[in-house]
Amino acid sequence: MLSGLQAFFDHSRHTLSVRNIEARLDVLAFEGHEHLSQPFTYRVEFTSTERDLAAETLLGQDARFSLHAAPQKPPASGFSAPAVKPLRTLHGVVTGFKRQSGSNDQARYELTLQPRLALLGQGRQFRIYQHQSVPQIVESILRSRHDFEGQDFLFSLKRDYPRREQVMQYGESDLAFIDRLLADVGIWYRFTSDERLGIDVVEFCDDQRLYQFDIALPYRPQSGLGSSGQDAVWHLQSNHRVVEQQVHIRAYHPRDAGAHLSGEIDQSRGASGTYGEAYHYAEPYTTLGDRLDQDEDLLSESGYFYARLRHERYLNAQTQLSGITSSATLAPGQVLHTTGGAPQAFTPGAVITGLTTTAARDSSLVATFQAIPYSDTVCFRPALQPKPQIAGTVPARVTSPQANDPYGHIDLEGRY
């Protein structure tokens, strides 16, 4: 089947450009890794007649990598070929660069392309955020410390999130801190492109209604036949396992010792393949919420809110889907619908959660994807990240809202 694909996908058509680099960069091969709630990473091998590109001219520079379809048949004599738009373009920055070899004619290089958000993984911070919600904290970090502007990110959220009294960042990079906060409340993110501005955009979402649904590909098992120039999927697999049937939560509110903060939730709606109870104690909530409320009607960061998120994570692992495609436009966050007798597990639609794409001048584009079945009641949730541990003595300073105040003041609860 791959031999058939080579006829309609010409890898010499892929283009790579880096800001302030005028030399032509000819793509030799590439490998890309994408996943929901993770910065993508594309490693692109290329050749250039510039035999000694300086690393300082590439690292940190904006770059663009475009995937093109095979060229159309040449036009009749006297007519120019129409401009062909790329199938997909990835915008980002160069975070890695390597010179592999060289000759008298050209040199071979490799660069790593990632979104600007990946740069937040450098460094670590110790900070306190007060009276801000999780989206507000994320936005303040992006804007104030990393010069993101309104066109660089988008919050597509179905629910409102309460302000937290205090949140601490302790010895974490800004990316690790953001990932930990977002995972805690079930917010996931993906990357899109603004072709008008030529930038990558990170989009934050919290509901399955925010998936992209207009993706359909035929299922064509490998049989040695050509694909007639049409993208398809094959080698579809499904992996099933028993997961927790319900989640039981309990917490203690020190300011209201008599508060009822115990409950249980079952998001499987009686589906088979579940067993057992997962007991979660001391989740960060002070209000239980209403068990019968659905979607955004359920109080954010309440007990049942956290219980549903925890159970959704268990249910995400119940069925894992995978497959291979020749499509260059498939991306995480899309719901793939397959036609042509695909396995039953793919019938509801496959939510693409991860993607590994490879191609070279001598091999066709192949994208191996991971997915979960689409559900109206269960959404993809990023894995919880461990909180940093504070050990030993931590020196600090008692402060006051008044400038040069000689005294430290306490509130009604005895806190500075």
Language model feature labels by segment:
Residues 1-416:
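Amphipathic alpha-helical and helix-coil boundary elements used as assembly
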